[in-house]
């Protein structure tokens, strides 16, 4: 077999970011009702996002019909790509979806908060699929800056994504549908109308600073808030800082004078 590199495709190991849909009940009727309720306010928010079904929170001996959950997610326009399960949950491989291994980006000491919701933070290990380079669609803007501070001085349009391994500084507007992600702090000296996720590897000390807060989503270390829960008038469109306090997002006016 020839080992010559093909100009048309390649196979290599890689990491793919997905949402984790964590199942905590075997009551599928209740799950469906809650899912529809959650998405009816913002039906386009997670449209076409890939998601892995996580069943690790189920009790020993419990199991669910993954095919039904897969259909539920399809019904709200999400795209299930696999299942994350414990080694003892052998039934999880019966749904026709591949079993995936997830690395939780939250720190081991972090607790699950009942009143909070996990942000799209896990990394799922998978092999990259073969692709013809000539047929690829333009990818969203995706930048890394090692562990250094990354500075962005141009507007971010819908569909663009920025990822910083350290802190992230944005000097131009972040439009609806754009996403900025950092393992450290995020500073936005312009309107934030898209998504901002700080401390994505479980850094509970990370903060978000913004001079005009009008976001679709804000998140720190896996705790997030969307427009489903409207922001109060004293912070909407204002200069703010966002931090975590006991697993809750605190949004506070930023006094600049």
Swiss-Prot record:
Q: What does this protein do?
A: Cell division inhibitor that blocks the formation of polar Z ring septums. Rapidly oscillates between the poles of the cell to destabilize FtsZ filaments that have formed before they mature into polar Z rings. Prevents FtsZ polymerization.
Q: Can you name this protein? A: Probable septum site-determining protein MinC
Report keywords, A-Z: Cell cycle, Cell division, Septation
* Assembly description: Interacts with MinD and FtsZ.
Q: Which organism is it from?
A: Burkholderia lata (strain ATCC 17760 / DSM 23089 / LMG 22485 / NCIMB 9086 / R18194 / 383)
Q: What family, per the record?
A: Belongs to the MinC family.
Known InterPro entries for this protein? Answer: CAP/MinC_C, MinC, MinC_C_sf, MinC_N, Septum_form_inhib_MinC_C
Please list the GO biological process terms of this entry.
cell morphogenesis; division septum assembly; regulation of cell division; regulation of cell septum assembly
Coding gene? Answer: minC
């Amino acid at each position: 077999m020839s080992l010559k590199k093909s100009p048309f495709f390649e196979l290599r190991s890689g990491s793919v970011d997905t949402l984790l849909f964590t199942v905590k009940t075997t009551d599928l009727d209740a799950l469906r009702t809650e899912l529809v309720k959650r998405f009816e306010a913002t039906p386009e928010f997670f449209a076409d996002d890939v998601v892995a079904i996580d069943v690790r929170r189920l009790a020993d001996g419990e199991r669910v019909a993954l095919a039904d959950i897969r259909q539920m997610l399809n019904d709200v326009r999400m795209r299930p790509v696999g299942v994350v399960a414990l080694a003892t949950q052998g039934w999880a491989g019966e749904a026709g979806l591949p079993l995936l291994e997830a690395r939780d980006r939250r720190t081991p000491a972090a607790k699950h908060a009942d009143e909070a919701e996990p942000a799209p933070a896990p990394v799922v290990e998978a092999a990259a699929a073969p692709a013809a380079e000539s047929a690829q669609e333009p990818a969203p803007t995706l930048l890394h800056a090692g562990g250094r501070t990354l500075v962005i001085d141009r507007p971010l349009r819908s569909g663009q994504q920025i990822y910083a391994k350290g802190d992230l500084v944005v000097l131009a507007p972040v439009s609806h549908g754009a996403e900025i992600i950092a393992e450290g702090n995020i500073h936005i000296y312009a309107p934030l109308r898209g998504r901002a996720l700080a401390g994505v590897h479980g850094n509970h000390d990370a903060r978000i600073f913004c001079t005009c807060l009008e976001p679709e989503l804000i998140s720190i270390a896996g705790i997030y808030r969307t427009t489903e829960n409207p922001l109060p008038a004293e912070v909407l469109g204002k200069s703010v800082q966002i931090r975590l306090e006991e697993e809750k997002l605190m949004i506070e006016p930023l006094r600049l004078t």
